[in-house]
Amino acid sequence: MSTIRPVFYVSDGTGITAETIGHSLLTQFSGFTFVAERMVFIDDAEKARDASQRILAASERYRVRPIVVNSCVNPYLSVILAESGALMLDVFAPFIGLLEHELNTSRHSCVGRAHGMVDFETYHRRINAMNFALAHDDGVAASYDEAEVILVAVSRAGKTPTCIYLALHYGIRAANYPLIDEDLNSDQLPLRLRPYRKKLFGLTINPERLQQIRQERRPNSRYAALDTCKREVAAAEQMFSAERITTLSTTHTSIEEISSKVLVTLGLQREMF
């Protein structure tokens, strides 16, 4: 059996749902090279037939059955896609019937409900959270009064991407504070952070991994030196321990996992967008 498998994320909308679920499924299988292609806004029969032909062509090119992760709402489009002979993984089909029976009503076949701008209030909360994260990146803002979360770590430990993820996916007002040499000379929290102790969450990282990341940013600099990374990480961890700040290593942890841990630890109940 070939270890190369073509994968198609097909959607009548943005494809975010299909790609997210498909990626989560495929990461469970090692030893394969998945060649992925996104087919989005497949919202009529003509587009579905064209997509089906492209999928069929891939099966002939790779001499193996393609995998299709399909989130098209219209069942008729799914039938056309299935004519390609691919393995069809329908995101909605296994659950729609069960929900219709339980709720005693039929679904509304409306494209884009999962990631469309359906609720304007929610959308604006999300945008405002994103603006907040950018305005409070790397300790730029003077006040953290409105922050729901403040991530604390040395430079390049994963603070900014986690804040952006929390803002985009949960509408969380997330700020971050970079620990600098002056901060790391003490086991105590920096003065700016002390009033916000209940909002703090510490991130740490393996020094060797940190050195690799910093080397890409500033090659052969003192900033990227391994001994610098070791010293900063050790000092930050000592501070977190002394101040009893919950800490998580980002070395082998995804942004999704970090974000979930932050929400649970700080008791923030927020529905994912």
From Swiss-Prot:
Superkingdom: Bacteria
EC identifiers of the protein: 2.7.11.33, 2.7.4.28
Keywords per UniProt: Kinase, Nucleotide-binding, Serine/threonine-protein kinase, Transferase
Pfam families (UniProt xref): Kinase-PPPase
Keyword Transferase: yes
PANTHER family from the UniProt entry: PYRUVATE, PHOSPHATE DIKINASE REGULATORY PROTEIN 1, CHLOROPLASTIC
Protein name (record): Putative phosphoenolpyruvate synthase regulatory protein
Species annotation: Xylella fastidiosa (strain Temecula1 / ATCC 700964)
